[in-house]
Amino acid sequence: MRASVFSFVLVMALGGCFSPEPRFFTLERVVGTIVRTPPRVIEVRRPGLAGYLDRSSIVEKDSAYQLDVNSGTRWAEPLGDMIGRVLAQDLSQRLAGSTVFAESGGISANADLRVELDVQLFDRAGDGMVRLQGQLAIEDGSGHRRLSARPVALAAPAPGTDATSLAAAMSALLGQTADQVAQEIALMREAEEDLAR
């Protein structure tokens, strides 16, 4: 009897030592409306991230003052690099004919424009809404002259409560950000043409 109890306790203790393998998630490009502009070279700078987001585990808001860090779900790459990469992919699709690259990638070139995003909040709140808040700037590539700077405040419902749904909603918000950037770049070009007349 003692041996079987000991064996049971040993098996349970060893089972507690093994945790399941973490699951890895990524953000994906979201197709948007193509904006007609003359070809440009555009660099997407590595986004700044609020410290609570700059980690491998996926973070969600549990309440107004509490975060839930799930060690079983992780980002497949550093979140700042991934946001920059996906935003560059989104912009490349929307600005057909332009060359768009992420600062964190392997390409470097003299850019006509630089897009900068400072992410202050990017998570799912208790109400199921995923929010992206921060600052967005577009600057001239040669002289670092600021052409546009404004706040970003977007929200979208997550289609479910799992990490896949969170990643899908976050991807959609990056797509909306790319829509706004593409429109701003198109308006800048129109303003340049008006000044040249």
Language-model-detected regions and their locations in the chain:
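Sec-dependent bacterial lipoprotein signal peptides
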Residues: 1-15
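Surface-exposed helix-capping loop/turn segments at secondary-structure junctions
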Residues: 95-101, 183-197
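A structural "domain/chain start" motif
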Residues: 17-80, 188-197
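Surface-exposed short loop/turn segments
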Residues: 18-36, 94-143
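Extracytoplasmic/secreted envelope proteins and their assembly/folding machinery
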Residues: 80, 84-88, 92, 171-174, ...
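Short secondary-structure boundary motifs at beta->alpha junctions and helix caps
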Residues: 67-74, 142-180
